[in-house]
Amino acid sequence: MKALLDLFKQVTAEEEFDAITIGLASPDKIRSWSYGEVKKPETINYRTFKPERDGLFCAKIFGPIKDYECLCGKYKRLKHRGVICEKCGVEVTLAKVRRDRMGHIELASPTAHIWFLKSLPSRLGMVLDMTLRDIERVLYFEAYVVTDPGMVSNLQRAQLLTEDQYLEMVEEHGDEFQALMGAEGIRELLRNLELDSEVESLHAELEVTGSEAKNKKLAKRLKILEGFQKSGIKPDWMILEVLPVLPPDLRPLVPLDGGRFATSDLNDLYRRVINRNNRLKRLLELKAPEIIVRNEKRMLQESVDSLLDNGRRGKAMTGANKRPLKSLADMIKGKGGRFRQNLLGKRVDYSGRSVIVVGPQLKLHQCGLPKLMALELFKPFIFHKLEVLGYATTIKQAKKMVEGQEPVVWDILEDVIREHPVMLNRAPTLHRLGIQAFEPTLIEGKAIQLHPLVCAAFNADFDGDQMAVHVPLSLEAQMEARTLMLASNNVLSPANGQPIIVPSQDIVLGLYYATREKINGKGEGMYFADTAEIERAMAAGQLDVHSRISVRLKQYEPAAVDGEWEEKTVRVETTAGRALLAKILPKGLPFKAIDRALKKKEISKLIDESFRRCGLKETVIFADKLMQNGYALATRAGISFCSDDMLVPAKKYEIISSAEAEVKEIETQYTNGLVTQGERYNKVVDIWGRTGDQVAKVMMEELGHEEVIDRHGKKVKQDSFNSIYMMADSGARGSAAQIRQLAGMRGLMAKPDGSIIETPITTNFREGLNVLQYFISTHGARKGLADTALKTANSGYLTRRLVDVTQDLVITEDDCGTKNGFVVKALVEGGEVIEALRERILGRVTVDDLIDPETQETVIFAGTMLDEDLVDLIDKLGIDEVKVRTPLTCDTRYGLCAQCYGRDLGRGTMVNAGEAVGVIAAQSIGEPGTQLTMRTFHVGGAASRAAVADKVEGKSAGTVRYTSNMRYVTSAKGEKVVISRSGEVLIVDDHGRERERHKVPYGAMLSVDEDKSVKAGAKLATWDPHTRPIITEYAGTVRFENVEEGVTVAKQVDDVTGLSTLVVIDHKRGGKAAVKGVRPVVKLLDESGQEVRVHGSDHTVSIAFQVGSIISVVDGQQVGVGDVLARMPQESAKTRDITGGLPRVAELFEARTPKDASVLAEVTGTISFGKDTKGKQRLVITDLEGNVHEFLISKDKHVLVHDGQVVNKGEKIVEGEPDPHDILRLQGIEALARYITDEVQDVYRLQGVKINDKHIEVIVRQMLRRVTIVEPGDTKFIKSEQVERAELLAENDRANAEGKIPATIEHMLLGITKASLSTDSFISAASFQETTRVLTEAAIMGKRDELRGLKENVIVGRLIPAGTGLAFHRSRKAQLAGEDIAASRQIEEATAENTTQEADQGL
């Protein structure tokens, strides 16, 4: 009996492990795994269906086919366990050993492993320092390789010889030297490789070499050789002498009916290898001619190649039906491979799926579960209960009862599911709210009922969506589901900390309708004692729900003494509907919170307010009541609409005709040659865009207001009760833009390529479209549908990359103790506060004490988390910048600390240790991805708005200031013309605090003087939006140089107008090739005919024209200061489509260098222009020490600086998108983080999506997690190696402790794909992308995966180190160390540092 118990123990004993290493297997290792050699290609006997002996399914090698039964049937049953049958040689044991017993094939000739040969860069090539082409020639028997030159002087090791050269050498030198062909040759070379001496010589070479390319090559080779050294793997193991054979149950052969077999492709591939191997053995025994043997060896090499990775070299081997066979490599890579299909995504038991329907009667924490589903899902629980209660004696009997659906079973089912939460999931699960737990209530029917308020989180609707149910089984699982996942515990969205349980659609409409006010409604001005009286009056038909009345309401205020609620009765003047709603307000929310027309935004604020003031429980109850009331009220209101509700404004037609007149006027200007084709198009589009908005405005005026007569007989305006208007105004359905299409004018349409068609649709859907208008409409609409399909896939891929890069980021400690942080200000653009300071710092932890600017005393201490009240205080004190902690400056080695992260947005409290903040960040950014557009349409979007700004107006009153880089000249007319590119106008208040700032472009006219006070709405500057002028800062007579027709300028005659203009052309297209590097310039002469010089220098003034500019002056003309010399039509800059939406976000996170990247100043210094070379202009910056830095910039780029300007390091000097890598290099991490955060937020803000900055910062932290070694000092690194930040810090700590020189580094920015692939964990990287490459590299280096991230742990099937798993692993490690759990923290921290040290000393 004891033996039996031991058996069960041995099966279930699970090994605890903390890391996994991967390496190359030596031939002996492979033989030691094997249970016997597979000698024959046969599989099973087609008559007896028994496996052939020594074949691919041989029972002697791999184990019995039936449990405890040998093949010939001599031994059966358990009592013979472990006996080996003497007749058939099969061991009597469990049949499942066929899943893990391996065999082997002894190869008659060694074979190279294709992964190490062909996966780029070729590892074999790097180790031997030979090219891949050469190695292949040797392997596939086209050339000999010298393995031992012996005494022959003109031969080197690893030199290639052709057949003829070899024969010549043999004739000459006989057997003094050795040269081999095929894998044997390569194996010899690898065997003779002296690793230690090679590594030393490489180190020596690295010291002396100068060239960058050589350096890189040597470093790569050194890294591989050191990898072999460290891991103790011999290089010649990359050549296979023994091939392992996969256990047969992992490559099954299944008989189908009709005598055919379904087989795994691997069996075919193995059969080919065995056939060729056996043939080769026979040929060798027969001493066949060399050429035949060679051919056979080559074929063997090819068949082994296809077995390992089919199609990697040459044509893929195909089966009978012409499709490529699936090799071992294909089994593990890609979406259907082992990693993503079986390890990261598994199907689970105890789950079901069904269609969802709405369940408005449910409480927030409930869902309706069909009885039949529940019966099936909770079967084991029911069986148990039936036994315990004595209804059934055996499980079998219980099963019968359940299947027969006896009445008692239903009572027990009710009992079992009480308080047992189930998890509901709707695919695609884009963020953590896509799986939530509910308490099931049993319902008839077959559809799952879902609470309406959680639809937003699941992104569910009831048009046929399906959802899956999962049952948490263990008590711990139930507890976690209940405390963490219950729908009522997830009121806030983890992406932005705002409520996600928000009423929408009908509920909003009902609440809005009930809280609207109607002038002179029935019963207006009545007085009521309490709400019950109101209800009676309404039931009697004496009172309208919208009427203004007075009523006594109970209000609750916290008592001064004990903080209990005190009840007060106050008389309030309000509407009947609002008074009735007051009944459901939780204590702690004042009545004024609902004393207004409740729109969707207001209701969201209301729930937020309730959460902050009254806590979670009250809020959930309140939300449920709001929902029930909203539905009831919407039903009672009976709002519907018809075509008469779409009121077309009478003024529409005159607005349109005036616009048509304007367009005609511009057409006339165009025919007279005053504007160019491009300007005309821009202006026309602007006019129609404006007109559309005007019509919409007039329409909303008419639709949204109605005149009524009040009690005193006066005419007054009030918000209209038009159904369409109410739906849009409340935020229930529809928007102003949609109403505009119904009753205004449809406006401008876009073509599929995003450009705007200049003829707008002047009619609306109410009036109907004609054929042309309908056709123009379909144009853009179809594009929208095509985009949606692409968008979903792209968005999913972005999310996958984001999750992969951040999956191992977990909160691991409370405080890392850093004193660093970022200074945060309000985000201001174009004078508008886009994001207030309070929103950006809410939930962050302060770095410094905050001081009241008035009294200079500390109001908030360092290390405080800023909650709503503190943020209000900061607002009140007028503090305009705060230094806060951020994930980017956190000093925690593996993971993040709670203080740097701040508030957990989904819970509203400080983040807990073990929270997987990385994954949450990735989900928060990825989830709204589907809402982002693929390409930005410029219709009514921000793009078309920004293009036509032609003035700046102050929003607030104050004093005008200019920034230091604002330069202007005063023209003869007294106008101040701006000649700086990046000047800004500020308005400051009386305390000198900046209220707003506006960028002023080059060539603008300033309308205000510095230090003058202005009123709100004052015009600050104006400019022409459609052209960019070139302005002179000096007066004089114009003299053209290099202005030659057909060479540098072209006369352009407009077909329509017949007028000619001089346009600067690219001289490359001019006829003469002799005049390279000349550009048209204007020199200015003074009265005496001398060239005018730049003030304070002897440079002459020369103003160069850019390609494409239209010259406005003629030779010899007198010009004054601030005059325009030429203008550059703006449309040329406008045609470059702004990358928007999803592709823009992906581009930022992938850290791609933009197409037309701008150039940033490398140093702080003074600008000058050097000699031009062909097609390039030379820009020179002289820094403060007098060192010169040159940039070559192509002529068509727009330079933002001018001669003599002083620029700061990192400032833009050429127009374009900045390259994030440059920002990091020149301005550091903070500037980079700010750039990426702002740019990503711009895209999301355009779509109205809110995401907290810290999520983006978390991703940027992961993009910065690797560093480049600049000087290795006394560390183990080599120069320009890339290493993980944590590894570097540990190594530097060690160097410092030993008093050695630590390494110096520079930060590097990796795109998210690169960052995921370069993670320390090879398991995580392999399951992401490029599986082959990752695994080959890891195997050679003998890498060790510490299983720190979440993904690795899911793959190996352990509890993930996040949440409760973090505590579990910590306590487990502490117990292993023989310590009590209290000491586990010190151990955890110490081990993180020690592991790297031990690894180093162990070498």
From Swiss-Prot:
Zn(2+) 2 binds at C816, C890, C897, C900. The RNAP catalytic core consists of 2 alpha, 1 beta, 1 beta' and 1 omega subunit. When a sigma factor is associated with the core the holoenzyme is formed, which can initiate transcription. GO terms for molecular function: DNA binding; DNA-directed RNA polymerase activity; magnesium ion binding; zinc ion binding. Gene3D superfamilies: 1.10.132.30, 1.10.150.390, 1.10.1790.20, 1.10.40.90, 2.40.40.20, 2.40.50.100, RNA polymerase II, clamp domain, RNA polymerase Rpb1, domain 3. It comes from the Bacteria. This is DNA-directed RNA polymerase subunit beta'. The gene is rpoC. It catalyses: RNA(n) + a ribonucleoside 5'-triphosphate = RNA(n+1) + diphosphate. Disulfide bonds: none annotated. Its EC number is 2.7.7.6. Zn(2+) 1 binds at C70, C72, C85, C88. SMART domains: RPOLA_N. GO terms for biological process: DNA-templated transcription. Binds 1 Mg(2+) ion per subunit. Mg(2+) binds at D461, D463, D465. Belongs to the RNA polymerase beta' chain family. Keywords: DNA-directed RNA polymerase, Magnesium, Metal-binding, Nucleotidyltransferase, Transcription, Transferase, Zinc. Its cofactor is Mg(2+); Zn(2+). DNA-dependent RNA polymerase catalyzes the transcription of DNA into RNA using the four ribonucleoside triphosphates as substrates. GO terms for cellular component: DNA-directed RNA polymerase complex. The lineage of its organism: Bacteria, Pseudomonadati, Pseudomonadota, Betaproteobacteria, Rhodocyclales. It comes from Dechloromonas aromatica (strain RCB). The keyword Cytoplasm does not apply.
